[in-house]
Every structure is written in C-alpha cells, then in structure tokens.
Amino acid sequence: MRINLNFHYDKLHLKEIIILIPKYHTNMVSFLTPILGLYGINVKEFINDFEIKTRFINFDVIVPTLVKISKIKTFEIILKTPYVISILSNLNNFSVTKPNIDLLSVYKISLLKSVFHSNFLDVFHRRIYLSLRKYLSLVIKVNFHLSVSSALAKKSLSNLNNLLLLKFNIQNNILFAKLLNNRYGLFVSFNNSSASNLNYLKTVLAIQNISIFKAKSNLLSSLTGNKYFFGNIYFIGATSLKYFIGFLKEVSLKSFGSNFFPIFFKIRSNLVSQPFVKLFLSVFNSQVKLINFYALRVIYTIFIKIFKNLNFLNKKLTFLLNRNNSNSNANISSNIKES
C-alpha cells in the first residue's frame, strides 16, 4: 500500500470522508467498494490497513474511520472514537432501553474512551496506563505498544512512585486544611525567604494569633485566573476576622526600613472585584456569614485602593524583620506580658 505523507498540500488533497465500518463484516469488500471505488482506492489494500490498525478491538463494534484521499489515489486512515453504545452493549446485563450497569462499569467505559481518544502515550503518563490496564482488560483487550524498561517495572520503583504520590496528596491535604482554618488573610511573595527571617516572622505573628505558611503558586493562579504568579509564596491569615483587622491596623501605623522586601501581588482589579471575593470565600470558607463577606470585601477593596501602587509589606511588615536579636527578644517578651 502506498502511503503519501503530503496530505496537507492542497495540490494533492482530494477528499476527506468518514466511514462507519463494522469490525467483522461478512462481506467487507462489497460493503466498501461503492464508497472507495468512487475515488479509485483499492478496497483490499484499505481493508488490510484497517485490520492492522483495529487489531486491538476484539469484538464487533462500529468503528468511525476518517479517510483522507489524495489525487494520486493514495489514502490515510485515522480511527475515530467508537460509539459508546456499541462498547456498552458488550457488557453484561446491558440494555439500551433499560440500562442495568454498575458505577464501576461506567468508570471503565470512561477510561476506555480516554484511551481511544488519546492514541498516543506520553512518557509521564505511562505509569498511569500501566495501572489502568487491569480495569480495561475486563472490557476490551488493548495493545498499548509500550516500550517500558525493566527498571520501570520493578516493584521497588513502583513502591517509590506510590510513596511519592502519597506524600504529594498528604501535603495538599495539609495545605487546604490550613487554608480552611485560617479563613481571613492574603497571599504574599518574598524575594528572600531565609529560614531565620521566616522563623522570626512566624514567632512575632503568632503573638497576634496570625499564621503564616507556604502555599503553591498555582493555587493563587487558579483563584485569580492569572498564570504569572511564581516565587516564594506564603499565606498570612487568621482564624478570626478581628485578629486580621488588628493585624492590618498595627502594620499600617509603623515606619520601616529594611532590605528584606516582600512583594504584594499586583492583582488590582481582579482582587477587588466581587467575583474574586466570592470565589475566594467559596473555596476557603463555604459557611461564611453574609456580614463577614461584606466586611472582608471592604477590607480588600480599601486595602488595594490605598496601596495598589506600593509593594505591600515592603512598607508595612518589614519592621518585624529588621530588628536585631536583642530588640526582637525584648519586644516578644513585652508583648507576651501585655497579652
């Protein structure tokens, strides 16, 4: 069979047709001759190529096939996603009029459609498809054509991958638990996030019942719809609105001078808009009361309008970071006594 690789040129492109071909037809030649014969395509060559590309389908199913035909009587076959009804009909106790399949069968069908739709395997996704093979084998026998090295199939590496995935999920759960607990706060990015400065900042903020912890940049990007957030991102927040208001009031009255410059994200209109506040509250505080919603909205609106041209915390928080050890210890002790 001749394969022409230049189908994207208009001078060779003639026609694109979609044919619904049964996998096992009693007389495939007579079925395809009226269609392909119009363009001078050899039916037997087409069937041979079709059989090779549909070898992984082991039961009767209608396969939508896109055929690209050139002016020099060559063709290219592209398999489309098979009909879901045709695949479901091969499951036990399935009826089109009265469906009787369990949730696991629906899950396996969704995976099957994904494999048909993505007929290529990425190096990063190979481990995922290996783990799904046992589910897919219950519905259809799929030939994945994987060139997996022996090291990838070793049990020790598989266990290591499972541990890494478990660690990643645990870290995400801890992060969201902290965000749900500290419902009022803001995101900041530090140019310099040394351990000593951060530990000191955590200690001083803890006196005011304020928490600070590291967050992922893609979390803030997903909230605001922007993709330019990167760097050392932290969330500063409190469990109570009054603690957060007291925090903003205190830092707005101080004078500063330091080379440790935190940067406030220039979200501007996105941050002060009502949709962002609603999204922020729906993610981190689904049970917030209406009065708290408007209070937090007013805080963000006033805060950004006043400091939108400044680097927040560059002028408002650095006093917590430029004290020497002796002064910091004295301040912490005095604050503890007052409280």
From Swiss-Prot:
Record keywords: Mitochondrion, Ribonucleoprotein, Ribosomal protein
GO biological process: translation
A GO molecular function held by the record: structural constituent of ribosome
GO CC annotations, alphabetized: mitochondrion; ribonucleoprotein complex; ribosome
Family according to the record: Belongs to the universal ribosomal protein uL11 family.
Protein name (database record): Large ribosomal subunit protein uL11m
Phylogenetic lineage: Eukaryota, Amoebozoa, Discosea, Longamoebia, Centramoebida
Primary location group: mitochondrion
Location in the cell: Mitochondrion
Top-rank taxon, per record: Eukaryota
UniProt-listed Gene3D superfamilies: Ribosomal protein L11/L12, N-terminal domain (3.30.1550.10)
